[in-house]
Amino acid sequence: MSEGAGTFRMVPEEEQELRAQLERLTTKDHGPVFGPCSQLPRHTLQKAKDELNEKEETREEAVRELQELVQAEAASGQELAVAVAERVQGKDSAFFLRFIRARKFHVGRAYELLRGYVNFRLQYPELFDSLSPEAVRCTVEAGYPGVLSTRDKYGRVVMLFNIENWDSEEITFDEILQAYCVILEKLLENEETQINGFCIIENFKGFTMQQAAGLRPSDLRKMVDMLQDSFPARFKAIHFIYQPWYFTTTYNVVKPFLKSKLLQRVFVHGEDLSSFYQEFDEDILPSDFGGTLPKYDGKAVAEQLFGPRDQTENTAF
């Protein structure tokens, strides 16, 4: 946890001022996407208080309660509960705090999310065998997925996926999901990201019928499982742009797997990006995602995530 998190008390007048500031934020009001958060912005602390029920005086207590709940549940001998306790052994307070924030400081729900986090790894071991930054680096360099180096005006991390040039014989669906898993773990080390969350932009321009036919329902279910109750991440929105008419067939396969909360956060724009631009400023988006910046550069982002190639740590998650 960063040293700057919650180191002062605010009077109501200050809180009202910060709430007003939250209504008029720009991308410049937020910290970097990559690397740790050295100090949370004051307006982000207020957001955590208002949206996540976070208070400085109860933060440590909530972490302790979750740690105790993990051990109490494991004592029952239930298989998944034991696996959870084994998985979190040696984890610091910052690790537990991610789950508590993701469930708005409700310790019981945070524990259920922790169970989901461990269960996802048990359910899909093929995604986590020998998983490391080096193992997914080539996939990230190819842009599957991408990450904007600037937060959006709401402070969210923006993840990108451009399906047009994706060849499933060169990069498999599982390899893409592995890259997502590594990136999420890495970016969730940042407290600002824990509070503000993520959004995803999926560019389906050039999506072919052959690609659509190659997407198995089991793969799509695996992707949805990753987004729902398997990471201590707040997924705030998923935006689809430039999708062809037959995208509906693929989407209809996915929809039954989506819980109502996530389904309400899916936006399908097509060619009309007017509402899309109300959410995202063009000057933070690459040209291949409807913006004014140069085309997305996956190699540059991989270096920001993992460092130069010769310094990449081969540390399994």
From Swiss-Prot:
Gene Ontology terms: biological process: visual perception
Primary subcellular site in the record, as a coarse category: cytoplasm
Coiled coil: none
GO cellular component terms given for this protein: centrosome; cytosol; nucleoplasm
Top-level taxon in the UniProt lineage: Eukaryota
SUPFAM superfamilies linked to this entry: CRAL/TRIO domain, CRAL/TRIO N-terminal domain
Domain spans labelled CRAL-TRIO: 136-297
Binding positions for 11-cis-retinal per the UniProt entry: Y180, E202
MF term (GO), any: retinol binding
Residue positions, PTM N-acetylserine: S2
Tissue: Retina and pineal gland.
Keyword entries, A-Z: Acetylation, Cytoplasm, Retinol-binding, Sensory transduction, Transport, Vision
Pfam families listed in its UniProt record: CRAL_TRIO, CRAL_TRIO_N
Disulfide bridge map: none
Compartment(s) where it occurs, according to its Swiss-Prot or TrEMBL record: Cytoplasm
Description of how the protein assembles with itself and partners: Interacts with DEGS1; the interaction increases synthesis of chromophore-precursors by DEGS1.
Job description of the protein: Soluble retinoid carrier essential the proper function of both rod and cone photoreceptors. Participates in the regeneration of active 11-cis-retinol and 11-cis-retinaldehyde, from the inactive 11-trans products of the rhodopsin photocycle and in the de novo synthesis of these retinoids from 11-trans metabolic precursors. The cycling of retinoids between photoreceptor and adjacent pigment epithelium cells is known as the 'visual cycle'.
Protein name as catalogued: Retinaldehyde-binding protein 1
Biological source species: Bos taurus (Bovine)
